[in-house]
């Protein structure tokens, strides 16, 4: 085997590992969103606005170039060059277009993966990452992350109080 073949094999192996990490991270992002929706105790997946359009209570996406939320499917979101997945969760704070929907930036990174489970670091709005160890279908692994997201939303809502009422 030539030295070039060695390099080609190594390059192929690294690309395969990157794909494995992407698959794992997107699976866990999907599980986080699913857990979060259930954890919130939403009355339904969607609410109907005054025009009869269905609006999701929780939506996933990214902030576009114009600074606006762009919905996207997790499996279509690009991985960052540092091996992380950055997404934005938009949560409606009521069933009315006049009530704010709050966007929360969330970043996931696989720290390790093995037969026992997967270790993921999740940061909410750039805060210190929350370590999450997930085994199989352990639903409650994301409780601390959900609480952090809720806290972020509460602070965003409280900032909207009129100054005279603070």
Language model regions located:
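Acidic-enriched, low-complexity/disordered segments with a strong bias for Aspartate over Glutamate
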Residues: 5-6, 20, 49, 59, ...
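Generic secondary-structure transition motif, activating predominantly at the C-termini of alpha-helices
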Residues: 8-15, 40, 93, 153, ...
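Short, charged/polar micro-motifs that form catalytic or ligand-binding hotspots
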Residues: 15, 19-27, 75, 132-139, ...
């Amino acid at each position: 085997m030539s030295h070039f073949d060695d390099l080609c094999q190594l390059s192929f192996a690294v690309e395969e590992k990157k794909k494995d990490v992407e698959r794992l991270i997107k699976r866990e992002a999907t599980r986080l969103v699913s857990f979060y929706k259930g954890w919130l105790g939403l009355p339904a997946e969607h609410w109907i606005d005054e025009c009869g359009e269905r609006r999701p209570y929780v939506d996933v996406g990214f902030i576009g170039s114009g600074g606006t939320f762009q919905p996207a499917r997790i499996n279509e979101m690009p991985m960052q060059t540092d091996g992380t997945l950055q997404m934005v969760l938009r949560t409606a704070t009521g069933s009315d277009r006049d009530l704010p929907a709050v966007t929360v930036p969330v970043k996931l990174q696989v720290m390790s993966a093995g037969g026992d489970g997967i270790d993921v670091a999740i940061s909410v709005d750039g805060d210190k990452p929350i370590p999450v160890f997930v085994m199989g279908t352990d639903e409650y692994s994301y409780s601390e992350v959900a609480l952090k997201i809720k806290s972020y939303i509460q602070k965003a809502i409280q900032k909207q109080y009129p100054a005279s009422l603070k």
